Structure formats: C-alpha cells, structure tokens
C-alpha cells in the first residue's frame, strides 16, 4: 500500500508517525512532500526512513491513499498543480479543516473516492479521537483500510459530513478546552498556598491516573465519581460547591461557539 502526504505539518506528522509506529505499514511505502521547504522535508523524511519528492506525477502514480494536509488557503494552488496527474487508483483523505468533499472534488476535477477526517493533536501519542466522513463511492474494503490506518493513531468515529462540525468542537478542539480547565485547576490549587510547581506536577499525575481509571474500568464516569464520593465527606463538599454553577450551560456555550465557527469557516472556504 502506497501512501502520499501533501503537507508535512504537525498533524500530518502525528498521523504518519502513528502509522509507522503501528507497524501496519513499511516506512518505505510512505511518501512526503511539502510546499517549498525541501531541507526541512529531507531532514524529517530521513529521520523516519520515509521517502520524499516534489515530482507530483511520480507521487500519485500507484498511490493508494493521498492525504491532503495543506493549509486550506493553499489548497487551490495544490489542486491546480496535481489534478492532471491524478489516476483512477488514487483515493483521497483530507485533513483540511472547513473544505467540503464536494469542494475538494471540484478543485481536483475528480470523482475519485474521498474521505474527510478530523483528528486531534493527541494523535502525537496515538490517542486521537478522529471523526471521519466518506464520499458515497468509498467501497467497504477501502473504508476498512482507512479505519485501520486511523486506528494506528487513535480511535475513529464515522459520521455524516454535516456532523463533522460537531466532532470538530467536541474532540477536535477538545484537548484545548480540557487544557484550559486544567489551567484553572492549577491556578485555584496555587491560591490554597502550595507552590505552583507542586500543584502543577500533582495535577499532571492526577489527570494521568484518572485517565487510566477511565480506560481500565467498565463503569461510567458518573459511577466512578459516585464510588469516591462519601456522604458528608470532603469530596461531597467540593461537588456541592460546584453544583452551584451551571457547568453544563458553560460547556454548551463553549461547544456551540466552536460548532458555529467551524460552519462559518466551511462556508467561507467553499465560496
């Protein structure tokens, strides 16, 4: 299986590094290219043992999956460059935010199978939650192959294209939202009189430990919370204080704003 990556930014790097580390694919079957920084591309490709090239015809020849990972505003130039070299064997996977399947196909002048994926930065550690939407002509065998590729850097959830906006908000932007919550937790802990480095290190380990509990348990998060909450205890007192605030509405506003912005960007790019 030959994979080609157009764009070698942080997200693309996380994806193909995960694929290589999973041993699902030989590094020699992966080809990278970027817009212009050949020295950086060469250095990175040699470090991973993958191929790199600026020859679009050679890149697309016999390519099974072509990842489109350029910045959205650079895509039109890329499409102008590669459309004449597209073959019937090429299936496309876009990681470009805001560009619809119809728009990408129009720019590439092709009806080849195309999928849009929305990973998050946890792909760097093999734990992305990736939303995916397929064009109607993506056959079941190819879908399974794409799922296997994505599972190399996390988990996958298939949704309709219109619901990728919601996935973008919940899981795509999710790490940043959680980092922000943890930042506030550190600030509040520091206000109690402990040294900031002590609080930050403690909360880092708290997050890791809690994540492992969620991962290893069959219980819901609600039940896990109840299991460590004793009536009249310190945990109950803290939860009672939290219940005075409408946390659900806060997150609804947060996610709603992200969904709306995703839709705005999509309409803007597709114009």
Curated annotation (Swiss-Prot):
Gene Ontology CC terms: cytoplasm
Pathway of action: Amino-acid biosynthesis; L-proline biosynthesis; L-proline from L-glutamate 5-semialdehyde: step 1/1
Subcellular location: Cytoplasm
Top class in the EC scheme: oxidoreductase
Presence of keyword NADP: yes
Function: Catalyzes the reduction of 1-pyrroline-5-carboxylate (PCA) to L-proline.
Name this polypeptide is given: Pyrroline-5-carboxylate reductase
Organism: Staphylococcus epidermidis (strain ATCC 35984 / DSM 28319 / BCRC 17069 / CCUG 31568 / BM 3577 / RP62A)
Name of the gene: proC
């Amino acid at each position: 299986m030959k994979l080609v990556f157009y764009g070698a930014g942080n997200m693309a790097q996380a994806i193909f590094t995960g694929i290589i580390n999973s041993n699902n694919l030989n590094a020699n079957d992966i080809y990278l290219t970027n817009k212009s920084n050949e020295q950086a591309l060469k250095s990175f490709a040699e470090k991973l043992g993958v191929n790199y090239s600026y020859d679009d015809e050679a890149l697309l020849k016999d390519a099974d999956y072509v990842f489109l990972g350029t910045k959205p505003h650079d895509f039109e130039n890329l499409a102008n460059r590669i459309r004449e070299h597209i073959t019937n064997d090429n299936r496309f996977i876009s990681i470009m935010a805001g560009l619809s399947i119809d728009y990408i196909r129009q720019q590439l002048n092709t009806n080849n199978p195309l999928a849009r994926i929305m990973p998050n930065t946890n792909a760097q550690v093999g734990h992305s939650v990736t939303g995916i939407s397929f064009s109607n002509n993506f056959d079941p065998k190819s879908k399974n192959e794409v799922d296997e590729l994505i599972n190399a850097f996390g988990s996958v959830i298939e949704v309709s294209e219109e619901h990728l906006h919601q996935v973008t908000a919940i899981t795509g932007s999710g790490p940043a939202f959680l980092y922000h919550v943890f930042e506030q937790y550190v600030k509040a802990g520091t206000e109690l009189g402990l040294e900031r480095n002590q609080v930050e290190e403690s909360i880092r380990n708290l997050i890791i430990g809690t994540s492992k509990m969620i991962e290893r348990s069959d219980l819901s998060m609600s039940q896990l919370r109840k299991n460590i909450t004793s009536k009249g205890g310190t945990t109950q007192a803290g939860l009672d204080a939290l219940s005075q605030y409408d946390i659900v509405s806060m997150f609804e506003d947060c996610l709603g704003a992200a969904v709306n912005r995703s839709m705005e960007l999509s309409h803007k790019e597709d114009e």
